[in-house]
């Protein structure tokens, strides 16, 4: 049987294809070995994962102080004049300084409280790094005509303990200030006009931050004077919220200015008093 040209071309083609396939297989095998070698060399330069993890675990702890209490800003307290002096600062107020320096100031105080003898004036401790200036009384401010009072009475015979009370009212934005009582300003930092204040309902009516760890009281009183803040209805709502928070968290009971139980009807009556006061003030200005 003779093999023709066609058959020879087929045989040669098969041999060529087989050679190409063999050469490709050989090259592929060699490239895998080189790739593995490169990977081995690359990973050999990386730090050991276990050592890195151990370093993280054994490294120095990083403490995040998430609870920083704002500093006092005694800016513009015309009706509560007192000679400031340098005093001891509580640890909680010292931690607050850095955070509160960035807070914007929001307005001027428009609250004159020359009333109750319960709130006797005296020198105050101002936790401020800058030298304090003597606060002078603004004689142009009108006298307080009405005072809205909400008292919180402790149900416990031991009363409200100083540290817990301080923590609670700081969370509500009150800051220690003039006359050694607490004030709620427009800003949580203690800047801007005073919205309302809180005093110790037990004589002499003040708080001693230097001895707050041993302090306790059976009752505190929140009060808002009229004329006072520019937006008295909103300020009153903030005061109600602060009083309710204290009563809820420290087991207290809300009382009105007659020491009767504070009800929703009483709160609405207070709001109506504010509306009536604003109406009278508007009428007087127009007259």
From Swiss-Prot:
GO biological process: division septum assembly; FtsZ-dependent cytokinesis
Gene3D superfamilies the record matches: ZipA, C-terminal FtsZ-binding domain
Disulfide linkage: none
Cytoplasmic side: 23-287
Ranges facing Periplasmic side: 1
Top-level taxon of origin: Bacteria
KW Transcription regulation (keyword) present: no
Localization in the cell: Cell inner membrane
Database matches in Pfam families: ZipA_C
Basic and acidic residues bias spans: 64-77, 85-104, 121-140
Keywords in alphabetical order: Cell cycle, Cell division, Cell inner membrane, Cell membrane, Membrane, Transmembrane, Transmembrane helix
Membrane topology note: Single-pass type I membrane protein
Annotated region described as Disordered, given as residue ranges: 48-140
Subunit structure: Interacts with FtsZ via their C-terminal domains.
NCBIfam families referenced in this protein's UniProt entry, alphabetically: septum_zipA
Record's protein name: Cell division protein ZipA
Natural source organism: Pseudomonas syringae pv. syringae (strain B728a)
Lineage, top ranks: Bacteria, Pseudomonadati, Pseudomonadota, Gammaproteobacteria, Pseudomonadales
Gene: zipA
């Amino acid at each position: 049987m003779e093999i023709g040209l066609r058959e020879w071309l087929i045989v040669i083609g098969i041999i060529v294809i087989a050679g190409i396939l063999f050469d490709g297989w050989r090259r592929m095998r060699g490239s895998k070995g080189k790739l593995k070698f490169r990977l081995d060399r690359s990973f050999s330069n990386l730090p050991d994962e276990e050592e890195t993890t151990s370093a993280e675990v054994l490294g120095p702890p990083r403490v995040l102080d998430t609870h920083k209490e704002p500093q006092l800003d005694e800016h513009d307290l015309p009706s509560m004049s007192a000679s400031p002096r340098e005093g001891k600062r509580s640890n909680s107020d010292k931690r607050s300084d850095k955070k509160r320096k960035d807070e914007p100031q929001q307005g001027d105080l428009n609250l004159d409280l020359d009333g109750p003898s319960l709130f006797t004036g005296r020198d105050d401790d101002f936790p401020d790094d800058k030298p304090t200036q003597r606060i002078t009384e603004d004689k142009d401010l009108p006298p307080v005509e009405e005072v809205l009072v909400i008292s919180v009475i402790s149900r416990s015979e031991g009363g409200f303990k100083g540290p817990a009370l301080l923590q609670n009212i700081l969370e509500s934005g009150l800051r220690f200030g003039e006359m050694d009582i607490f004030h709620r300003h427009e800003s949580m930092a203690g800047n801007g006009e005073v919205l309302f204040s809180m005093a110790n309902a037990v004589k002499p009516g003040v708080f001693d931050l230097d001895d707050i760890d041993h302090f306790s009281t059976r009752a505190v009183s929140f009060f808002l004077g009229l004329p006072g803040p520019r937006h008295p209805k909103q300020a009153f709502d903030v005061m109600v919220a602060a009083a309710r928070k204290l009563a809820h968290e420290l087991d207290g009971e809300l009382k009105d200015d007659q020491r009767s139980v504070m009800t929703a009807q009483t709160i609405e009556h207070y709001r109506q008093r504010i509306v009536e006061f604003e109406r009278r003030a508007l009428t007087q200005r127009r007259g």
